[in-house]
Amino acid sequence: MSSLLIGYYSKTGNTKAMAEYIAAGAREAGANVDLLPIENVTVPSLLSYDGIILGSPDYYGGMAAPVKQLLDDSVRLHGQLAGKVGGAFSSAANIGGGNETTILGIIHGLLVHGMIVPGVAVGDHYGPVSINAPDERVERQCKKYGLLIADIARRLKDEG
């Protein structure tokens, strides 16, 4: 059984709702999930997870400051997160408002750590996105993403 962290920053509740859907999908796959506001995530705790998924609203085409701060502070663990599975998700107010650039910014930080970040062949390719409050499509994408990350984390753990 794999253990996942889903850390998120949410001002309006939209990103939190996405995180909850992702957690539901991961739990369906049998993962132990810690669902935490980003302010409650500590850098040392990142070592205890097989997979780390971070979510942020889009702020001017990038991630919220608390998410960026966690990634910046995680430099203390450089190299120690290599081989873990990572992922990202985002919400925004507008279509074309910066969801993908926000997700890619988070993914860049995960890749620098040597984490494995899978793409999604059908749907939201870089990770789930929502425009305003998550609708049924977003709920499906989030649950599917949680299943995907949990399954990969479990397989890697079983092989390791």
Where are these regions (language model features)?
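FMN-binding flavodoxin-like domain, especially the glycine-rich phosphate-binding loop
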Residues: 2-5, 14-160
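Extracytoplasmic "Venus flytrap"
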Residues: 10
